[in-house]
Amino acid sequence: MKLSDFDFDLPTELIAQYPASERDNSDLLIATTPPIKTKFYNIIDYLKEGDLLVFNNSKVIKAKLNLERNITINLNQKLSDDSWSAFAKPARKLNIGDEFYSDNHKVIITEKFAMGEIKVKFELDNISVFEFLDKYGEMPLPVYIRRSKRHGEEEESSDEAISSQNPEIATESKRTPSNDDKLDSLRYQTIYSQIEGSVAAPTAGLHFTKEILDKLKAKGVQIAFVTLHVGAGTFLPVKTENIHEHKIHTEYCSITPETAEIINKAKQERRRIIAVGTTTLRTLESSCNNGVVKAGSFETDIFITPGFKFQTTDMLLTNFHFPKSTLFMLICAFAGFKEMHELYKYAIKEKMRFFSYGDATVLYRKV
């Protein structure tokens, strides 16, 4: 299939710049025929006793570092305790051996590659890399979340952006960069995140509250966790018209023996397995061999396109994705190429909000 097969027209005003007023107050589209539009807090009505919900418990780190000379680096993947791969902008300003300082801490450029990719080494004074990032870094929001002027372009004020995107989130006090940072630190993180390592949020989980999880458990819905540390490569565009020539960056995954046992038992008992997010689905499918999920830690570069044979997942909860993205290709593989194009047309007509801070949809695997 061609890259152009996965294109569709998306009005820019549907790209969510802020989260909904409450996590579970976002819209939810159930991919039935016809589709059902509801609120996320009603997801309980579409799950049943015995269902297994699998979440990604990776925690987003403050992976964006603003350095001297107007250089920004976004960490991508941990290579060792003190070394990370990263993307730099503008990379042309960097040379191997460049050093940047914050107090008694040092960030060193050790390697430089094409497409802005670099390797960095941290020489820190009695703190870990994660502690350093928590103090000096920023939440690594996607580039399509644009709340201030960039490159001389005129944009809406934060208040105007909020009101036009979602009237429910209009605030009494004026938004400021400082307040936005606090908001993102809270809302660009799932409530169940545990293991530090992601440089982008597993966004399908952002809608869940403790109350929803408690109600699901009370209903008899089982919950399990896997880990996939989301890399910056998740935002890289596909540039080849032949989609199979595209290469995905590797990402670290982990499944505990306990979780593998829970998933395999659910499969044996023919209970529904629902992946919360594409990262969870990719972790499950990467670990599955002959229908059995294997425990362990590993790296995956799995690229799921139409024709892929799914072994683990019956339903997928996910946000709305970019045109021509690897994730839109994934949902077309999961729930049907024609069906997803039709569903997205409906979502756009209903003015549902797209991408990281946007609305969610429940998809059913096409048999």
From Swiss-Prot:
Q: What is its EC number?
A: 2.4.99.17
Q: A GO molecular-function term, please?
A: S-adenosylmethionine:tRNA ribosyltransferase-isomerase activity
Region labeled Disordered — which residues? 150-182
Q: In which pathway does it act?
A: tRNA modification; tRNA-queuosine biosynthesis
Basic and acidic residues: bias regions? 171-182
Q: Name one GO cellular component term.
A: cytoplasm
GO BP term, pick one: tRNA wobble guanine modification
Pfam family name, one = Queuosine_synth
The source's superkingdom equals: Bacteria
Enzymatic reactions: 7-aminomethyl-7-carbaguanosine(34) in tRNA + S-adenosyl-L-methionine = epoxyqueuosine(34) in tRNA + adenine + L-methionine + 2 H(+)
Question: Which key words are in the record?
Answer: Cytoplasm, Queuosine biosynthesis, S-adenosyl-L-methionine, Transferase
Q: Where does it live in the cell?
A: Cytoplasm
What is the annotated quaternary arrangement, including any partners?
Answer: Monomer.
Q: Which NCBIfam families match?
A: PRK01424.1
- State the similarity comment: Belongs to the QueA family.
Reported function: Transfers and isomerizes the ribose moiety from AdoMet to the 7-aminomethyl group of 7-deazaguanine (preQ1-tRNA) to give epoxyqueuosine (oQ-tRNA).
Q: What is this protein called?
A: S-adenosylmethionine:tRNA ribosyltransferase-isomerase
Species for this entry: Rickettsia felis (strain ATCC VR-1525 / URRWXCal2)
